[in-house]
Amino acid sequence: MGWYSEISRDISKIPTAVQFFETELIQARAECKLVGNVEKSAAQMPGIVEHRFNQLQEIEAILNYLNIELRRLRSSYFKKYLENYQRALSSRDVEKYVDGEADVVDYEKIINEFALVRNKWLGVLKALDQKQWQITNVVKLRVAGMEDASL
């Protein structure tokens, strides 16, 4: 079972999920380095990319879930202000009040933190793409006769 299922059942597991993905990020960054046997690196690339891309997709799904929950929370506050406030408020006024609610602000901070984790993972996927490009070029150089190309 993945982190998406855990968080959708219990939102309090977000800090643990962030810590997990940060730890995985450190390992993923090590996988971005091109050292050692080129053939071995080339053989491992599809599995590495698949694993890390799946992790990125899980982060994206969690982020989407958090945004859905934020919209639900904002909607409940919006409704509260429209129905229970003493004077008539414009939609813009209500929006400003909702944006200032502590729960809404806290949720936006959580979403921002998860978005940062997602952006770091996007960087890892770009680095893995570059690694694949480098492997391809080293192989082409070897085919062209430059056997002494080292990493």
For each of these PLM feature ranges, what is it?
Residues 67-75, 106-141:
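Long amphipathic alpha-helical coiled-coil segments
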Residues 60, 80, 122:
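Catalytic phosphate/metal-binding cores of nucleic-acid and nucleotide-processing enzymes, i.e., regions
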Residues 23-54:
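Short, charge-rich amphipathic alpha-helices with coiled-coil/heptad character
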Residues 42-45, 49-56, 111, 116-121, ...:
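Extended alpha-helical coiled-coil scaffold domains characteristic of the BAR superfamily
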Residues 142-151:
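Acidic, low-complexity, intrinsically disordered peripheral segments
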Residues 66-110:
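Extended, amphipathic alpha-helical coiled-coil scaffold segments used for oligomerization/tethering
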Residues 1-30:
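Extended, charged low-complexity scaffolding/tethering segments
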